[in-house]
C-alpha cells in the first residue's frame, strides 16, 4: 500500500486556481508545488500571474521565480525535482497545482528519457530558426523525423526546435526516444480539475488581462524587451506586447490580442485535461465540496 498521496489541482488559465489552492494547502498544512512553466521565471511575475509575496507568505511555494529567463529548464528536469521534493516531505500529503500540461503529465505519468541538449546545439538551432524561419524548420523536421512531424504542434517553435535538436545531436529520430510508457509512482494521485461556466471564465480572463496592464505588465515587458528572442518569452502576453513596443500594433489591439489568445489557450488546456478521465471537476468556489472529495478518496485508498 502506498503511504503518500499527491493532490493535483489544475484548470484553465484564469479560473481561480491560486486562491483555491491556497485554501486547500492551508487545510492540509502543506506547501504548494507550483506547476507553471512560466511562473518559474523571476523577471515576469505580473504577466504570468505568479503568486504574490503575500500569497507566498500564507503558504510556502516551490517553483515560483526560482529561475532566470536565460536558464534552461524542461519538463524532464521538473519531473525529477518534484519527485525529490515529494520524497523528502515528511507529510503524507503533497500538493501540486498549476496549468502547465506537460509539467503535470511529467510528474503523474513520467516523461521519456530524452537526452539533454548541448548548449552549442541549442545555440545553432536558435540561430537557424531566426535566420530561416519556422516554416523551413518544420520542413527540416519533416525530412529528419516524418513521424513526429505529423503530430508536433508546428505553430510552436519550441517544440519543433527541440525535436530537431534531438535529431541533429543524436543522429536518431525524436520519435525513437518516445516510449509513452506510464511510470509507476510511489504515491497515490488524486486529480482535481477546476472549471467555470464558459462566459464567466472568459469574462475573468478578459478582466485579468486588464488588471495585469494596470499592475505594470507593459513596464515588465519593456524591461525584458532586450531578451525578447528567448524561448521563455515566447508566450501569450509578451509576444503581443512586443509587437506593440515594436510599433506594429496599438496598445488596444495588443490587449485585445492577449485576451483572445488567452481564451484560446484556456480552450486548449481544457481539451487536454478532458482526455484524462481521472480528473474530478469542481467549481473553484466550492472548497468544502473539493475537500470532502479529497478526504473520501484518501480514506478509500487507505483501506
Please provide the spans of the model-predicted regions.
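Phosphate/pyrophosphate-binding catalytic cores of soluble transferases and nucleic-acid-acting enzymes
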Residues: 1-303
Amino acid at each position: 500500500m502506498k503511504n503518500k498521496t499527491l493532490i493535483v489541482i489544475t484548470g484553465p488559465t484564469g479560473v481561480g486556481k491560486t486562491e483555491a489552492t491556497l485554501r486547500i494547502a492551508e487545510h492540509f498544512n502543506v506547501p504548494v508545488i507550483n506547476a507553471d512553466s512560466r511562473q518559474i521565471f523571476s523577471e515576469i511575475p505580473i504577466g504570468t500571474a505568479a503568486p504574490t509575496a503575500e500569497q507566498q507568505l500564507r503558504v510556502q511555494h516551490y517553483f515560483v521565480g526560482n529561475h532566470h529567463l536565460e536558464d534552461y529548464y524542461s519538463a524532464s528536469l521538473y519531473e525529477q525535482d518534484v519527485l525529490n521534493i515529494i520524497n523528502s516531505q515528511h507529510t503524507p500529503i503533497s500538493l501540486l497545482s498549476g496549468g502547465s500540461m506537460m509539467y503535470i503529465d511529467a510528474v503523474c505519468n513520467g516523461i521519456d528519457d530524452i537526452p539533454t541538449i548541448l548548449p552549442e546545439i541549442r545555440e545553432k538551432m536558435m540561430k537557424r530558426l531566426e535566420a530561416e524561419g519556422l516554416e523551413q524548420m518544420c520542413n527540416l523536421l519533416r525530412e529528419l523525423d516524418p513521424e513526429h512531424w505529423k503530430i508536433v504542434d508546428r505553430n510552436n517553435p519550441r517544440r519543433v526546435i527541440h525535436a530537431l535538436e534531438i535529431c541533429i545531436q543524436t543522429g536518431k529520430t525524436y520519435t525513437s526516444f518516445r516510449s509513452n510508457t506510464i511510470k509507476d509512482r510511489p504515491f497515490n494521485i488524486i486529480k482535481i480539475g477546476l472549471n467555470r461556466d464558459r462566459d464567466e471564465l472568459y469574462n475573468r480572463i478578459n478582466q485579468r488581462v486588464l488588471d495585469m496592464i494596470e499592475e505594470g505588465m507593459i513596464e515588465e515587458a519593456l524591461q525584458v524587451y532586450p531578451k525578447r528572442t528567448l524561448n521563455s518569452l515566447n508566450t501569450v502576453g509578451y509576444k503581443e506586447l512586443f509587437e506593440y513596443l515594436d510599433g506594429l500594433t496599438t496598445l488596444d489591439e495588443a490587449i485585445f490580442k492577449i485576451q483572445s489568445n488567452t481564451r484560446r489557450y484556456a480552450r486548449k488546456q481544457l481539451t487536454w485535461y478532458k482526455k484524462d478521465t481521472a480528473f474530478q471537476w469542481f467549481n473553484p468556489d466550492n472548497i468544502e465540496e473539493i475537500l470532502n472529495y479529497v478526504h473520501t478518496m484518501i480514506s478509500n485508498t487507505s483501506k
